Amino acid sequence: MMSTRSRELSTPLRKFKCVVLGNVSVGKTSLITRFMYDTFDENYKTTIGIDFLSKTMYLESDTIRLMVWDTAGQERYRCLVPSYLRDSAAAIVAYDITRTETFQEASNWIDIVRKERGDDVIIMLVGNKTDRQDERQVSWEDGEQMSKESSSMFIEVSAKSGYNVNLLFKRLAQAMPGLQSTRLNRSISNLGWSNTDLDEMTEINLENAYELEFEKQCNCPC
C-alpha cells in the first residue's frame, strides 16, 4: 500500500478555496476548528474580519489542499464577501438549527454566492448544533428542501460533538472539480481519507488587513 509520503510526492497537490458563510454565532469557527484540530471551545470569540486555515487531504487518487476562509457574520462585513468568493471553488453556508432566523438568512447567503460565482462553485448548506435537539426550530426536511431549491449539497452536523463534521468535508472534497476521485468515486463509502496529516495546517489572522480593506472599499454603515 502506498504510504502517505509517497502519495504526496507522486500526486500533484491541487488547491481549492472554500469560504464559510453564515450569520453571527451559527458556529462557523467551531466547525472549522473541529475539522482542523478535532477540538471544541465553548468560549470562542466572534470572528472579526476573516481567518484563513488550510489542510492537506488525501483522497484515493488525489491529494488536495483545502484552504478554508472563516468569515465574519456581522452585517458590516457583508459588502466584502463577494471579493473573497471570486476565486473560490466551494462555499459552506451554515445556519443554527435552533434559530429559525439564521436558516432564513441562509438563503440570502446562497444568493450572494450564486450572484458572484454562478454555477462555478459547490455550495454546501450546513445545519449546525444537532446536539441541541430539544431546542430545534428548523427541521431536517426544511434544510433538505432549501438545498434542492438552491442546487446545493446538504448535511446536518454538530461542531460540539463532532457529529458529521469530517463527513461534511469529505463530501466537499469529493465534489471538487477535475479530480480523479470525483470522477471515479461518487459514493462516500469509496472515498479514501487520512486524518493523520495535521502538520500541513496554517493559520493566519487577517483581522487588521481586513479592517483596512473594509475602511477603504466598503461604504456600509458601521
Role assignments for model-derived ranges:
Residues N23, E42, I97-R99, S181:
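Short, conserved catalytic or interaction motifs in soluble domains
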Residues T29-D41:
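A conserved segment at the C-terminal end of the G1
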Residues Y44-C79, R86:
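Switch I (G2) and immediately adjacent beta-strands of P-loop GTPase domains
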Residues G22, G27-K28, A72-Q74:
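Conserved phosphate-binding and hydrolysis motifs of nucleotide-dependent enzymes
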Residues S88-S107, R117-D120, D131-Q137:
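Conserved Switch II/interswitch segment of TRAFAC-class P-loop GTPases
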Residues V68-W69, I92-D96, L125-N128, E156:
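Conserved beta-strand segments of the P-loop GTPase G domain that flank and frequently precede/overlap
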Residues R76, L80, T102, D142, ...:
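Short acidic active-site motifs
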Residues M1-S25, T63, D120-C222:
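Conserved P-loop small GTPase signature centered on TRAFAC-class small GTPases
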